[in-house]
């Protein structure tokens, strides 16, 4: 993603949200628009790799390791909900990762994470689409509209990333010439 200036969409959800029938084919919609999607269970786990994104937090003792979420959620009881919070923290630190946050059936275990995840992603300005209660009514048409709107947002975000990279490169080149 970084090498190609691509945006990857990280799915925050329960294991069943990877099922097209349960996620109303929302991942397929994004893939048909050219976006790669990644389940939070497939996100990087290598500590050396993760330290480039969590080094300051560890150095300042906000957390003990890149996997620690106690700085934002001290008492967590659900493994899956804790994984969602950690994945949001990772996405907030990686400029090429956007988030799709799904929940179904007013999931009680995930309810405590809604505000935490929203705060993490909002503070970092990480592009994110939240589809809570995805099974409410018959969301097919409204989901397609939201997917296309979010895809446009991601395209604009990707352009800004590319422009920033180009500006940084040009600045370095100019400084080397002086």
Label for each model-derived stretch:
Residues 1-178:
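An N-terminal assembly and electron-transfer interface module characteristic of large anaerobic redox
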